[in-house]
């Protein structure tokens, strides 16, 4: 006999756990009739009892299964298949019963209308805005989305403030970012794709100007500029026009605008011609192949047309100005031998800086020195001139002698850790420069030069003469000549001052006290120099203006030195711009110089040669005929005269 299976505690209370409290539904239809439904209906009860009976059968089946497993082991697979089939059948029966219960409940529950949710107003407004956008705005928005995808870090999404980047507003005068560009597109401020392209370039260049090349912002701006220029290239835009509908509409609207503008400006004859040209261009573009050669040819043809039309307009304007001048202007060429050296093919030229001192006309031996001759080129990313720094390899480090004091016989006498020359060379240097006090025959270069007469000084002067082409010796001669004259002048001034003081004392006794004070004050203010006497009031005003301009120039120089001597912050590449005080002083100096130059002739300000050189005008040298001088004839004539004069005396 098999062992009787013990009933589990959970099986005893299965019925109590399975039964749930039925739900009660109260339905009001028409305001009077009330129908009550409860989940404890007959169909539901029957299904409930069926589930219980199925559960009991399932338990009995488990028991039988165990008994069979103990008795029969080989036929397990067939029994499993049968069980699976029976379980599937029971599951289907359960699902059918549950579906029937749900249908009964749906019949008693009143029908409720499901209204669609209200659409938000923002979406409708956004759709209206999208519908109202012009083809140009849609095209620009499409390009902006492509450009912003190339900025995953969102460095250029919002404007940069001085709080984020110190001194940004002082360096970058025209900031730009993606949000500002979007706002411009929304306000319809862009008239073409080229304007968007210019603003995109400005945004990237601003970041590259403010940040150093080693920063991530500089690298991100450079990468964004490279990829953005590919997106905004003509080939990419042409491909977008072929693939997107509103890009093709963009070309039509632009042509219509050009036609209306041309017709409104009064160019009726040219309007019809442009329409024909535009229609022809559209037809050619429709049948044109996308080859690069054809595109280049079409571009060249358009550029030639544009240049020819511009030249015709310029000729018409010149003719109109000549006619309106009333004979003052003519088209004939001037019969002059002057020409412009720096004249460009389009007829324009450049104006150089006017400077009265010229190396050709000015003093002999004068040579202008430019800043580029004294210093090299500025490195990229460096905002200051590099000072002179001696190379470490050129520096000589001798052996260092050590002194430990007494009782140090076995200690090392010298240290050659950092020396780059030998001990013998170090001893030679120490003996020559007089640094070693132990040697009795030590001497220095200064003592050697003092005791060896003037030969080294002559060598140094001759070397300087070779370098300056004789300028050093001339300057020494001028100094020697000016020294006795200066001494004589100082002596004369001292005697004149003493005489004036002696003259002031007796005259002061005779004159009134006010005159004494006035003369004493004049002597103090002028430091003994004679007071300036002007011929007219205009000359006095002119001199005052010059003095004021000199003072303003000094103040401007001090302000500039103060600004340029301050160390810029490390995050700034460019120098700080001029301050408000510098701008104000420069404006005052300019106004004063304008007033002064208006009161004099141009020849007093600058020479004719300087003006011509600044404008790039070259005057041909005069043709020299038989202007050579026979030196032999001139030398023979005085000999004849001398013999003629000496003849009577000799006779």
From Swiss-Prot:
Polar residues biased stretches: 35-45
Record SMART domains: BROMO
The protein's assembly and partners: Interacts with IRF2 and HNRPUL1. Interacts (via N-terminus) with TP53. Interacts (via C-terminus) with EP300. Interacts with BRCA1. Interacts (via bromo domain) with histone H3 (via N-terminus) acetylated at 'Lys-14' (H3K14ac). Has low affinity for histone H3 acetylated at 'Lys-9' (H3K9ac). Has the highest affinity for histone H3 that is acetylated both at 'Lys-9' (H3K9ac) and at 'Lys-14' (H3K14ac). Has very low affinity for non-acetylated histone H3. Interacts (via bromo domain) with histone H4 (via N-terminus) acetylated at 'Lys-8' (H3K8ac) (in vitro).
Residue numbers spanned by region Disordered: 34-103, 252-316
Name of the coding gene: Brd7
SUPFAM superfamilies documented for this protein: Bromodomain
Tissue: Ubiquitous.
Start-end of Basic residues biased regions: 58-69
Family annotation (PROSITE patterns): BROMODOMAIN_2
Compositional bias of kind Basic and acidic residues: 47-57, 70-103, 290-316
Function: Acts both as coactivator and as corepressor. May play a role in chromatin remodeling. Transcriptional corepressor that down-regulates the expression of target genes. Binds to target promoters, leading to increased histone H3 acetylation at 'Lys-9' (H3K9ac). Binds to the ESR1 promoter. Recruits BRCA1 and POU2F1 to the ESR1 promoter. Coactivator for TP53-mediated activation of transcription of a set of target genes. Required for TP53-mediated cell-cycle arrest in response to oncogene activation.
Domain Bromo: 131-235
Species per Swiss-Prot/TrEMBL record: Mus musculus (Mouse)
GO molecular function: histone binding; histone H3K14ac reader activity; p53 binding; transcription cis-regulatory region binding; transcription coactivator activity; transcription corepressor activity
Major location (coarse): nucleus
Intervals of motif Nuclear localization signal: 65-96
Alphabetically ordered keywords of this record: Acetylation, Bromodomain, Cell cycle, Chromosome, Coiled coil, Isopeptide bond, Nucleus, Phosphoprotein, Transcription, Transcription regulation, Tumor suppressor, Ubl conjugation, Wnt signaling pathway
N6-acetyllysine: modified positions: 328
Residues forming coiled coils: 536-567
Protein's UniProt name: Bromodomain-containing protein 7
Cross-link (Glycyl lysine isopeptide (Lys-Gly) (interchain with G-Cter in SUMO2)): 21, 127, 186, 197, 201, 212, 241, 305, 344, 389
Chain positions found as Phosphoserine: 279, 289, 380, 475, 482-483, 621
Localization (cell): Nucleus; Chromosome
């Amino acid at each position: 006999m098999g062992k009787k299976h013990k009933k589990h505690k959970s099986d005893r209370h299965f019925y109590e756990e399975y039964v749930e409290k039925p739900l009660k539904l109260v339905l009001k239809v028409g305001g009077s009739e009330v129908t009550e439904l409860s989940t404890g209906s007959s169909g539901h009860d029957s299904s409930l009892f069926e589930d219980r009976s199925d559960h009991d059968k399932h338990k009995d089946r488990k028991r039988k299964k165990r008994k069979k497993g103990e008795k029969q082991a080989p036929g397990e697979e067939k029994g499993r298949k049968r069980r699976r089939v029976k379980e599937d059948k029971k599951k289907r029966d359960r699902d059918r019963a549950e579906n029937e219960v749900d249908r009964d409940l749906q019949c008693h529950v009143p029908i409720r209308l499901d209204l669609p949710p209200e659409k938000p107003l923002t979406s409708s407004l956004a759709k209206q805005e999208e519908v109202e956008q012009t083809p140009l705005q849609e095209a620009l928005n499409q390009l902006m989305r492509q450009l912003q995808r190339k900025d995953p870090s969102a460095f250029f999404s919002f404007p940069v403030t001085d709080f984020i980047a110190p001194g940004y507003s002082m360096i970058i005068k025209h900031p730009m970012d993606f949000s500002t560009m979007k706002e411009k597109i929304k306000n319809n401020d862009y008239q073409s794709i080229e304007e968007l392209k210019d603003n995109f370039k400005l945004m990237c260049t601003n970041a590259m100007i403010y940040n150093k090349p080693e920063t991530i912002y500089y690298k991100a701006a450079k990468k964004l500029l490279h990829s953005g220029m590919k997106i905004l290239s003509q080939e990419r835009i042409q491909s977008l026009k072929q693939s997107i509908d509103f890009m093709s509409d963009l070309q039509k609207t632009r042509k219509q605008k050009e036609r209306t503008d041309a017709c409104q400006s009064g160019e009726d004859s040219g309007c019809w011609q442009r329409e024909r040209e535009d229609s022809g261009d559209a037809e050619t573009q429709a049948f044109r192949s996308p080859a690069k050669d054809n595109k280049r040819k079409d571009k060249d043809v358009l550029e030639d047309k544009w240049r020819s039309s511009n030249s015709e307009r310029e000729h018409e304007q010149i003719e109109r100005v000549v006619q309106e001048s009333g004979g003052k202007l003519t088209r004939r060429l001037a019969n002059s031998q002057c020409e412009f050296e720096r004249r460009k093919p389009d007829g324009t030229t450049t104006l150089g800086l006017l400077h009265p001192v010229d190396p050709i006309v000015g003093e002999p031996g004068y040579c202008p020195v430019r800043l580029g001759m004294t210093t090299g080129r500025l490195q990229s990313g460096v905002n200051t001139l590099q000072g002179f720094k001696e190379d470490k390899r050129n520096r000589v480090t001798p052996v260092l002698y050590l002194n430990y004091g007494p009782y140090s016989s076995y200690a090392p006498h010298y240290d050659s850790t950092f020396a780059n020359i030998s001990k013998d060379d170090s001893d030679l240097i120490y003996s020559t420069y007089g640094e070693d006090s132990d040697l009795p025959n030590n001497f220095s270069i200064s003592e050697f030069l003092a005791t060896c007469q003037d030969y080294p000084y002559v060598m140094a002067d001759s070397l300087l003469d070779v370098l300056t082409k004789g300028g050093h010796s001339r300057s020494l001669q001028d100094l020697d000549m000016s020294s006795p004259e200066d001494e004589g002048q100082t002596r004369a001034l001292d005697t004149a001052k003493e005489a004036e003081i002696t003259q002031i004392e007796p005259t002061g006794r005779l004159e009134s006290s006010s005159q004494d004070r006035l003369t004493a004050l004049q002597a103090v203010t002028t430091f003994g120099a004679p007071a300036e006497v002007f011929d007219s009031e205009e000359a006095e005003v002119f001199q005052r203006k010059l003095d004021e301009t000199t003072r303003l120039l000094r103040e401007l120089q001090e302000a500039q030195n103060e600004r340029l001597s301050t160390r810029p912050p490390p995050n700034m590449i460019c120098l700080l711009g001029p301050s408000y005080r510098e701008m104000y002083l420069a404006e005052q100096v300019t106004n004063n110089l304008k007033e002064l130059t208006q009161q004099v002739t141009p020849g007093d300000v600058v020479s004719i040669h300087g003006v011509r050189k600044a404008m790039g005008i070259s005057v041909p040298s005069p043709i020299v005929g038989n202007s050579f001088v026979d030196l032999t004839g001139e030398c023979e004539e005085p000999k004849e005269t001398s013999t003629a004069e000496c003849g009577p005396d000799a006779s």
